[in-house]
Amino acid sequence: MTTYPNARRGDIWFVTDDALGGCNESDRTIRGARPVLVISSDGHNFTSPCLTVVPISSGPHRLDGTDSSNVILHSACLERLSAAVVGQITTIDRDHLLCFIGVINALDLLNVATAIHCYLELFKED
């Protein structure tokens, strides 16, 4: 079995633009790249060529608090105030990873996980 130890849940990476659809030019820190947060489990990350991620944006419309699917991140590894865009969960091939940025703190990761549960209504009873 092939293992892929280079990406973990909570990591922030720059990925190639073509890894994500609908990228907004103003959200890019490096031209042709976009930051993402890895949200898939480490068990999956170590054994799969794909990662589940959410894009990270510093766009003002993501930071105004009007959309509960945008989670403000308080990570020192981010150069400016940014939000995880939970409404754009996607899976990417790890070949799109460009460079490691850092790791978010445990509270931010918990807030992202909670927002994902709410966004997908994982615990809603019909």
Regions found by a protein language model. Name each.
Residues M1-D126:
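Conserved functional hotspots at enzyme active or ligand-binding sites that engage polyanionic ligands
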